[in-house]
Amino acid sequence: MAVTGPLTAAQQELIVTKGYDRPILSVRSAGAEGNKYGFEGGRVVKLNGTYHMFTSEMVADPHWVKMKLAHWTSQDRIHWQRIGTVRESSGDFTGRDPRAALWSPMPVFDEKNNRWNLFYVAYQAAPDTPREWLTNHEGRIWRAESTIAGADGIAGPYRDVGVVLERGPDSDPWEGLQGTDSFFPFQVGDRWYAFYGSARTEKLPIALWQVGLAEAFALAGPWKRCTKLNPLGIESRFIENPIVTKLRDGSYIAVYDSHQPDAIGYSFSADGTRWSAGQKLEVQTGKGIWASEVRTPLGLIDEGNDTFTLFYSGNEKIAGEHADANGIVLTPGALGIVDVRLERDRAGRSNSEAIGSGNSKASGGRSVPALNRNP
């Protein structure tokens, strides 16, 4: 039976075909010397057979403040070489420097201008108070552009162009002191959309972590919030850092950090604006649990025939380590992979049959502590 158009979320799901019982990149890896707290988030792209990883390195104290954005490459997904530091934060902890902490490097190729763009988050940082979470606040999304044209310019160097999204008079009511905590652009026809996130970190405990959409006619912007659609109803409590992949039938899948234990979340869309209720994909089972907490996916890499590599970050499991009063685990962050397949049900089951307990809006799963965030 031929597929004549995009399938609904009820007709497809991700299946893990192979798990790995250890991380592919950790503080023990060659090239990670001096990285105190490990790795978190970012994006992986595959270019001419080479995997390029742009990730956040939590190199020193203050935790989640003194950061490097780094570029790594691999030929086989398992063995990695550090190419260099793309950006480094100041580590200022007074609340005055708007680039005190840098997070979430997202490389995106602009075919129209034939250049790689790098989007990343810059935060102010200060000690928390009993009422506010200030470790990362007033996030602003920066756009940088490779100075080298063409696909081979992915390694940069990158020139900062300016801020494309931040909290201000045009913010939606659900956005808060955290500012803009993530940004991922993807193209739909002649228009660009971007997932972006925020939370009201001005009041503890933090009740919701949400995402919305922004739109632009060019990757460089200007970007405008899709206020009538926001916040998106993919998750009811917690969603961060969605990364979008276009599927072969023209539809879209987003993978993201969710509150479910040992899992990441994912959602489908036929048009890039209307997204299905979240489903969960367990990436750690049985003896393959190396992380005490699965955190942020770094995207899906299309390996052909509806198979993908899913990269994700997690806090390594270390005996005797526990979360602090804010739900933060200080064990080093590492990066892992699973092989996945997109299962397409052409007969079309009902929504409840297809999603079932995989709907991450269902009750249960890990609780979302006051500061259980994934920058």
Question: How should each PLM-predicted stretch be described?
Answer:
Residues A2-A100, F109-D181, F186-E240, K246-S292, ...:
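Beta-rich carbohydrate-recognition and catalytic domains
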